[in-house]
Regions:
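Macromolecular interaction modules
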Residues: 1-110
């Protein structure tokens, strides 16, 4: 499987708790239902420790069968069918700062 990861930044004006609550609740349910070809969906909410520097507010992991499925997902994001997801993202994300990575995992220790 191929994984797409994205570093997410909360929308200005939201508290950490508002961001996490919306992402985990409403958006998580929507993403799980609407994203085509999605095999697994994981949210990683940052635990911000005192004295540590953080870029962003969380990582999302989306698993797909192969690279073609990732490409189809990215193309889908440009269609009208993706509008409900994109509109929902605008409620809690600063999408202009999102950074995406497509990776292949290699387990070294399991």
């Amino acid at each position: 499987m191929i994984k797409m990861m994205a570093l997410l930044f909360k929308k200005p004006g939201l508290t950490d708790e508002e961001f996490k609550s919306y992402w985990k609740g409403k958006h998580g349910a929507l993403a799980g239902k609407i994203i085509p070809g999605l095999r697994k969906y994981t949210q990683n909410h940052f635990i911000k420790l005192p004295g540590s520097k953080y870029e962003g507010d969380g990582f999302v992991e989306l698993w797909f069968d192969d690279l073609e499925a990732v490409k189809k997902y990215l193309a889908w994001r440009q269609t009208a069918a993706a509008q409900p997801l994109l509109e929902d993202e605008n409620k809690f994300l600063d999408r202009s700062k999102t950074v995406r990575y497509v990776v292949e995992e290699y387990f070294i220790i399991k």
